[in-house]
Amino acid sequence: MPQPRQTQRARRGAPRGPSSRSKRAAILDVATELFGREGYEHSKWADVAAAVGIGSTALYHYFESKLHCLYEIMAEALEADREKFERISGEHADDFVEALRAVLEGAFDLTEHEVLRNRLLVSEQVLVGVHRTSQREEDARQLARQRTRDLEFAWATFLTRGMEQGAIPEADPRLLARAILGLYNSVFHWYRPRGGLELGEVADFYVERCLAVAGLPMDGAAAQARPKRAARSRTPARARSGQTATGSR
């Protein structure tokens, strides 16, 4: 029997719950926190569901597996890193050395959530090189792999410009890009938010060493004079709607 028009209109105007897109974002945020703090292998997929406030089986509506979720986290993080790199380097296009320093300092301007994300990227990078038989996992893996290459290419192109301008010595730009990124990424093997060192102290040390790898003289006095930067404690906007994993490892 057709329902009264008023009832149909009322139902159309009823408030809706969180969209699939926002729920997916919440899962990614919570998984980043949990995987980053506890370690990917030691984290339980069911704990992600509990923190988001959904049943374990509901996770499979968004991700085929815990590994599929990990690849998606990696792909999004790498894309964000590349966009941030291109934005900062573009803001200092007239002075390569200034741009290089700004890019390196910007790389350490991170929230605690982003630090955990970087820790996860570094610790599980090897999984990006392992072929998957599941099509969804393989597609996500290939995307993360391609975005790794895109970030390295952006760095190599940027460094080539510096060499062409005579700002840094000639070298293989791909190897130099990997050397700088490798030194930067090494921080996240050991750095922990709220540990013995502030992120600003780590940044002051590593920025100068990355500049030295590029062939520029270290400016220790300038590093000491710059104000210390600490990991920001702000919460990513999309994570505010859900709980975050707790505990440390």
Indicate where each model-derived feature is located.
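C-terminal peripheral helix-coil segments that are non-catalytic and often amphipathic
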Residues: M1-R11, G106-H113, R149-E164, L181-L183, ...
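Helix-turn-helix
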Residues: P2, A26, V30, L34-H68, ...
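Amphipathic, non-transmembrane alpha-helical scaffold segments
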Residues: S20, L28, L70, M74, ...
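Generic hydrophobic, amphipathic alpha-helix propensity
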Residues: K23-A31, V48-A49, I73-F85, W155
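Short coil/turn segments at alpha/beta junctions that flank glycine-rich nucleotide-binding fingerprints
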Residues: R37-E41, E114, Q165-G166
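Hydrophobic alpha-helical connector segments
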Residues: E72, E86-R117, A177-I180, G220-R229
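Amphipathic alpha-helical packing segments from all-alpha helical-bundle domains
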Residues: E86, H131-Q165, R174-R178, E201-D204
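Amphipathic alpha-helical segments used for helix-helix packing
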Residues: E112-D139
